[in-house]
Amino acid sequence: MSNDMTGPGTGRGVLSSLGDRMMGRASGSYAKVSKKSGPLDGLFLSQLIPALLLVLAGTITIWTASLTIADANFPRHLVGVALGLVVAMLVWRYDYRNLAGMTTVLFVLTCFLMVMPKIPGLGVSSHGMTGWVRLPLVPVRFQPVELGKVAAIFLMASASAQYNGKIERFSDYCRLCGTLLVPLALIVITDLGSGLVVLFLGATIIICSGAPRNWVLATIALIVGVSALVVITSMTDGLPHVLKDYQLKRLLVFADPSIDPSGDGYNLQQAKIAIGSGGFFGKGLGNATQAGNGFLPEAHTDFVFALYAEQFGFVGCVVLLGLFAWMIFATILLAMRIDAPFGKLVLVGCAALWTFQVLENVGMCIGIMPITGIPLPFISFGSSSMLTQLICVGIVQSVWRHRQKAA
């Protein structure tokens, strides 16, 4: 029997305790889920509705981008959305608990997806990065790292669920950190931005598994120290340069955009201009002059938030970010209602994935986060990203759908 089949009262880590205080676990309307409640109950819809509205917002934004940007292939975007919705439905029907306890299999799968672009004959370069894969006899390419994020969620949830919400031994904590470290090291080779996503979601799952605060704080201090050392050595002649030149440049541009006025600094400046020119209500659908006139690079991918903001203005941005907040908060509420450790932590991982990607993408467009190329969930152009986000929606619904079934 998997750890996810555990009854009420187990797996009560940080998230459960917070849920008890916020929601009143013993007596609130959400405290006892009726066995007669169907898949279309309030909590189900509270997470699904904003997700579908975000897909619609992304589709409209990419359609406007396709009017002036050749790479923004709108039919291909629609194919990605359709495929994602179909896969999400299949995931929703699948009992996610079949993956509980399969830590070794999930570990191997996650690592394989991370290194897949580096396999000779499979990896495809784009914009100087080898993060895509083109399978033999298949005329499409995809980013396995995006699917690797989903695998990492299940990996860390499976590895952490066995402790039932309380990690007591330091050796167990180190084992969890090591489980995260290996695929993280592999993904950083291909995509530093995605590596940060995996680090955030993995760390969030470990924290919500009941890791002692002192251990977590010490780990954070270690990560900060190592990161600072990596940056310093990469900037110093005669020392090993761990960061690639473009990665170091992006960090320096974050500190001072004038360092690279024709490269990343230019991209950031144009993104700010696009956002600011949108004003309060925006220029209107299809009237994004910064992107339309070619001033805003990667307007349909990395800087899609700037493209959206120019057309829909401050009000539109508030609505968009409100939808993200609604979806993420609803996912957290669902996690609070789940007693099974594995299901709870899977939902935590999905919420962490969306949270970090939204904060990083929006933050880099307005200059408060370094430029990393992390896509904005449901909005940025890219079938691999859209498929991953919709799979996560399906996972959330699967966890909620199968919450009542006995082992």
Residue ranges and their predicted role:
Residues 295, 307-310, 350-354, 382-385:
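Transmembrane helix-bundle signature of multi-pass membrane transporters/permeases
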Residues 79-87, 149, 311-329:
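Hydrophobic alpha-helical transmembrane segments
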Residues 76-77, 171-176, 219, 345-353:
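Alpha-helical transmembrane segments of multi-pass membrane proteins, especially transporters
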Residues 177-206, 233-237, 312-316:
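Helix-loop-helix junctions and helix-breaking kinks within/between transmembrane helices
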Residues 332-372:
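Loop-to-helix entry and N-terminal half of a specific, functionally important transmembrane alpha helix
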Residues 2-54, 59-190, 196, 362-377, ...:
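Membrane-helix boundary/helix-loop-helix interface segments in multi-pass membrane proteins
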Residues 126-132, 218-318, 341-342:
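Hydrophobic, glycine- and aromatic-enriched re-entrant/interface helices and adjoining loop segments
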Residues 199-207, 221-224, 393-394:
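Hydrophobic transmembrane alpha-helices of multi-pass, membrane-embedded glycosylation machinery
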